[in-house]
Amino acid sequence: MRNILLTIEYDGTNYFGWQKQPNKKTVQGVIEDAIKKITGEDVNLVGSGRTDRGVHALGQKANFKTESKIPTEKFPLALNSVLPNDISIKDAAEVSLDFSARYSAKQKTYKYLIYNHKFRPAILCNYVYHFPYELDLVSMQKSCEYFIGEYDFSSFCSSGSETNSKVRRIFDCYLTFENDCIAIYITANGFLYNMARIIAGTILDVGVGRFKPTDIPLIIESKDRTKAGKTLPPWGLYLVDVVY
C-alpha cells in the first residue's frame, strides 16, 4: 500500500466544486474516475480543502491510497492522459501512510483577482471579478495589514460553516498586480467558509471608501458577519498553494 500526494491545477468553471456530490460533476469525482481508469481501484481522494463551484486552483493538494505498481513519477502523465483539459496533475509524490492532505496542512494561500477597468472582459469573464470604479489602492494595501495575526474571524465566515472554532491565523495578506488585475493574496493556517472571498470583498469596500483601514480591527472584534463586506463571486478566487 502506498499513499500518493498529487498537486492539481484546475479551472473550476464547469464543476460543482471540489467535493464529490451525487449526480454532479465535481473535481474530486472526475479525478477519482481517472485514477480508477489507470489503476482499476476505487479510491478516496482526500483534498486539502473543498473549493466551491467556480473556484479555481493552481496548487490544490490531494492524496489517495493505492496498491498500484505504477511508479510515482508516472502518475501525472498517466492521469493527464485520461483527464479533461481543465484539470491537470502537476506533480505526484509518495508520502507516509498517515499523511492527510487535509489534516496535515500547515498553511494555505489563496488569491483573488479583481479586473479594475471600465469595460468588462470577455475572455477573462470566468477568471476575474470585474469592478469598473476607481479604487484607493493605498488604503486597500493598508487594510491588508490589519488582517495579519490570530483572531476569531466570525465576521468573515458565511453561515453554514461546519467548524466550531472560528479562530484562524493569517500569516500574510497583501495587494499586488498580475496581468492587468489587482491580486489580493492571503496566507493562513486555515480558512473558514467563504473567508477568503469575504476578506477580499471587505478590502474592496475599503477601496471605495465604505470602510477605513482602521475599521478592520473593529469588524474582526465584532464577530458579526453583517459588519464586514460582501462575499465576492467565486470565479475570481484561486487556491494557490498548500504547505505541509
UniProtKB/Swiss-Prot annotation:
**Disulfide pairings:** none
- What does the entry list as the binding residues for substrate? 110
SUPFAM superfamilies in UniProt: Pseudouridine synthase
Q: Which GO terms describe its biological process?
A: tRNA pseudouridine synthesis
Gene3D superfamilies, per database record: Pseudouridine synthase I, catalytic domain, C-terminal subdomain, Pseudouridine synthase I, catalytic domain, N-terminal subdomain
Which Pfam families does the entry mention?
Answer: PseudoU_synth_1
Catalysed reaction, written as an equation: uridine(38/39/40) in tRNA = pseudouridine(38/39/40) in tRNA
Please give the InterPro entries that the UniProt record associates with this protein.
PsdUridine_synth_cat_dom_sf, PsdUridine_synth_TruA, PsdUridine_synth_TruA_a/b_dom, PsdUridine_synth_TruA_C, TruA/RsuA/RluB/E/F_N
Identify the enzyme class: isomerase
**UniProt GO MF annotations:** RNA binding; tRNA pseudouridine(38-40) synthase activity
What role does this protein play?
Formation of pseudouridine at positions 38, 39 and 40 in the anticodon stem and loop of transfer RNAs.
Q: Which NCBIfam families match?
A: hisT_truA
What is the protein name given in its UniProt record?
tRNA pseudouridine synthase A
The organism encoding this protein is Caldicellulosiruptor saccharolyticus (strain ATCC 43494 / DSM 8903 / Tp8T 6331)
Q: Recall the taxonomic lineage recorded for the source organism.
A: Bacteria, Bacillati, Bacillota, Bacillota incertae sedis, Caldicellulosiruptorales
